């Protein structure tokens, strides 16, 4: 007969190569804490419901608390021979307290167990990732006031378009990161529901109290349908999708850093601690964190695709196809969180050269739109006509080797070719990128006052969201504390009926 905990049906054990192919213990270690927490809550519920006797409940809880203490001290390691984290914890419990340890698995399956553990891990990751994103937003919006007038060229179609400020650019990326954090926390209400008690797929003939375990585990409520609870992985797709979108947003940001830190642009300088050199070219300084943030976004996108493909052909009811979610899912979440943290730190130590940006904008015609606007506002020229006149000016300047710095040329051309008289003093101001930037007044624009408004609004939003995250985190801490306190009470001699009155449920 097989020696596995499930081996009664089998005449022999699986071979070593089958074990290597099928085990998940090697990637389950992150769920160990949560599996023990879940076990304690489940045993408390079984005792409270009268499914297990009080002596058995006390013995089970004593063993589990001992295991939790060992885990906290780093002394609990998973054995791949036990296949997964769930069989590992049960096997270790039986080793500690004997056959009574087998009563822990009453009215439970690994199918609802793994879903419960994975949701518990994911909800904590949602809080961590959202918090990191929001602190990144704080850094971006809390940049020095001088960066509201530090000029950068703004681009469309990878061509110089209009002057913007460093602070405006940071505020734009901050908005994207705020949406990323919103997507993550919006998933909370679909993640933080309790599959425990669904068993294999159809529920159980035991009278379980799923509301009680939901409370002890910090879930909002039990999942409604047992078959759905054990079968679905759409929530991993949702989180992976949010991670993929967020990773792509960070990739776009870092693409600009890579470009602007090149010698040709010389708009940004990445700190040495976020760059590496070349093994052959002594002069090189490579922005490797920014480059890898671009490259590693592919992991998150790839994970999303793999999860979708994994789930598409699996009908309701658990199949081992679904265990393939964990390596790629955890990997994507880890990579995305690491990328957030490193990009945030790099941002704090990246210097921008506003003088260089202003010089580039003088020479790349990016203030031409402002000339057209002046023709509309001061000379009552229809915008389409003003657009054509300014385009004619740019074409003539390019043909003659001029830039908008040559105000003598621009004023002469407008006067002689289009009968528009603007003084050289006024034209110099109109074409000055910093003056143009200061002139923007529309809501949401790059004008310093408007950027200040964006920063103020965004920082207030961040403060509110961080408070919500702290509340959610506190609720999880309190739920675990209540669960452990109840377990210690039973081990210490409190009867299960007394415990029920003590917790007020």
Swiss-Prot record:
Substrates-to-products reaction catalysed: 2-(N(omega)-L-arginino)succinate = fumarate + L-arginine
UniProt entry keywords in alphabetical sequence: Amino-acid biosynthesis, Arginine biosynthesis, Cytoplasm, Lyase
Pfam families (alphabetical): ASL_C2 (PF14698), Lyase_1 (PF00206)
One term of GO molecular function: argininosuccinate lyase activity
Primary location recorded for the protein, binned into one broad class: cytoplasm
InterPro entries named in the record: Arg_succ_lyase_C (IPR029419), Argininosuccinate_lyase (IPR009049), Fumarase/histidase_N (IPR024083), Fumarate_lyase_CS (IPR020557), Fumarate_lyase_fam (IPR000362), Fumarate_lyase_N (IPR022761), L-Aspartase-like (IPR008948)
Cellular component aspect of the GO annotation: cytosol
Domain of life: Bacteria
Biological processes per GO annotation: arginine biosynthetic process via ornithine; L-arginine biosynthetic process
CDD domains: Argininosuccinate_lyase
Gene3D superfamilies: Fumarase/aspartase (C-terminal domain) (1.10.40.30), Fumarase/aspartase (Central domain) (1.20.200.10), Fumarase/aspartase (N-terminal domain) (1.10.275.10)
EC top class named in words: lyase
Annotated metabolic or biological route of this protein: Amino-acid biosynthesis; L-arginine biosynthesis; L-arginine from L-ornithine and carbamoyl phosphate: step 3/3
PROSITE patterns per the UniProt record, alphabetical: FUMARATE_LYASES
SUPFAM superfamilies in alphabetical order: L-aspartase-like (SSF48557)
Entry annotated with the keyword Zinc-finger: no
Assigned protein family: Belongs to the lyase 1 family. Argininosuccinate lyase subfamily.
Name of the protein in its database record: Argininosuccinate lyase
Native species: Rhodococcoides fascians
Lineage: Bacteria, Bacillati, Actinomycetota, Actinomycetes, Mycobacteriales
């Amino acid at each position: 007969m097989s020696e596995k905990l499930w081996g009664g049906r089998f005449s022999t054990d699986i071979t070593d190569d089958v074990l290597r192919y099928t085990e998940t213990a090697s990637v389950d270690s992150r769920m160990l804490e949560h599996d023990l927490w879940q076990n304690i809550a489940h045993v408390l519920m079984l005792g409270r419901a009268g499914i297990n006797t009080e002596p058995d409940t006390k013995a089970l809880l004593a063993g589990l608390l001992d295991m939790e203490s060992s885990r906290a001290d780093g002394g609990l390691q998973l054995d791949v021979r036990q296949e997964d984290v769930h069989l590992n914890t049960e096997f270790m419990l039986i080793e500690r307290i004997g056959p009574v340890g087998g009563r822990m698995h009453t009215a439970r399956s690994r199918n609802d167990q793994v879903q419960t553990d994975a949701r518990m891990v994911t909800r904590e990751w949602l809080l961590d990732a959202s918090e990191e994103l929001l602190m990144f937003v704080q850094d971006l919006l809390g940049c020095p006031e001088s960066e509201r007038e530090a000029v950068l060229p703004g681009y469309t179609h990878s061509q110089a378009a209009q002057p913007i400020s460093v602070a405006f650019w940071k505020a734009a990326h901050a908005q994207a990161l705020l949406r990323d954090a919103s997507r993550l926390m919006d998933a909370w209400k679909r993640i933080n529901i309790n599959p425990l008690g669904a068993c294999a797929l159809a529920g159980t003939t035991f009278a379980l109290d799923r509301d009680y375990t939901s409370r002890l585990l910090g879930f909002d409520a039990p999942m409604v349908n047992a078959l759905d609870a054990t079968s679905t992985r759409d929530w991993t797709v949702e989180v992976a999708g949010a991670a993929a979108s967020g990773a792509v947003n960070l990739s776009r940001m870092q693409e600009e850093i890579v470009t602007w830190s090149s010698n040709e642009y010389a708009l940004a300088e990445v700190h040495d601690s976020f760059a590496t050199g070349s093994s052959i070219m002594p002069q090189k300084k490579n922005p490797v964190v920014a480059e890898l943030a671009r490259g590693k976004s592919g992991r998150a996108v790839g994970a999303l695709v793999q999860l979708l493909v994994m789930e598409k052909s699996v009908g309701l009811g658990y199949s081992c196809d679904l265990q393939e979610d964990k390596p790629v899912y955890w990997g994507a979440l880890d990579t995305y969180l690491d990328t957030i943290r490193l990009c945030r730190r790099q941002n704090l130590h990246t210097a921008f050269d506003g003088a260089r940006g202003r010089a580039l904008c003088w020479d790349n015609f990016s203030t031409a739109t402002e000339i057209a606007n002046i023709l509309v506002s001061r000379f009552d020229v229809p915008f389409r006509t003003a657009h054509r006149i300014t385009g004619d000016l740019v074409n003539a300047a390019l043909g003659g080797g001029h830039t908008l710095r040559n105000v003598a040329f621009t004023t002469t051309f407008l006067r002689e070719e289009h009968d528009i008289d603007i003084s050289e003093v006024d034209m110099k101001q109109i074409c000055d990128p910093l003056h143009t930037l200061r002139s923007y007044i529309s809501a949401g624009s790059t004008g310093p006052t408007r950027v200040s408004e964006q920063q103020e609004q965004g920082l207030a939003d961040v403060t509110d969201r961080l408070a919500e995250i702290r509340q959610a985190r506190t609720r999880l801490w309190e739920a675990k504390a209540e669960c452990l306190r109840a377990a210690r009470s039973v081990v210490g001699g409190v009867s299960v009926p007394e415990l029920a009155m003590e917790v007020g449920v």
